[in-house]
Amino acid sequence: MENVTVLLSKKQSHFNKISPNSSISDALCRMSCQNTDYLIVVDDDEKFLGLLTDHDIATKTVFANKSLTTTKVKQMMNTRWPVADADNTVEDCMKLMSRYNVRYVPVFKNLSFLGVVSSDDILQEAVSHRSKIFDVEDKNVSVTYSY
C-alpha cells in the first residue's frame, strides 16, 4: 500500500488552522466557511498543538452547555491524538484510526508537522484504485441482459 506522504501530496497544501486562544464560536465559523469538520490548532510559531473537531465541539461545549463565545479552543482541543510518521503506509493510518476510533491522523516527519490524513482521504484513495481496476476489466467484458 502507498506511503502516507503520497496521499498527503494529493491534498491541498493549505491547512485549516486556528489559534488556541480563539473562541469556539470563531472555530465554528471557520469550519463552516472552509467546509471542514476539523481545525489544526497551532501556536504563533505555527507549531502543531492539537486538533479541534466538530465532535469535540458538540460533546465538550454544546452538550456541556458551555458558552460558544467565551470558551477557548485550547480548552476543547484534543492534544492526545495518535500520530503517523511520514514513513507509515496508508494501511498503518487506517489501523490507527480503527484502534483509536478517530477520523484524522496528523502526520509528522522528524517532529515537523506535514499534514492530516482523514478517513475520507483514505476512502477516496481506495475508490480511486478500485475504479482503475474496474475500468480495465470493463473494457474486456461484454454484458448481455436477458428478460
Regions found by a protein language model. Give the residues of each.
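Tandem CBS (Cystathionine beta-synthase) repeat/Bateman regulatory domains
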Residues: 1-147
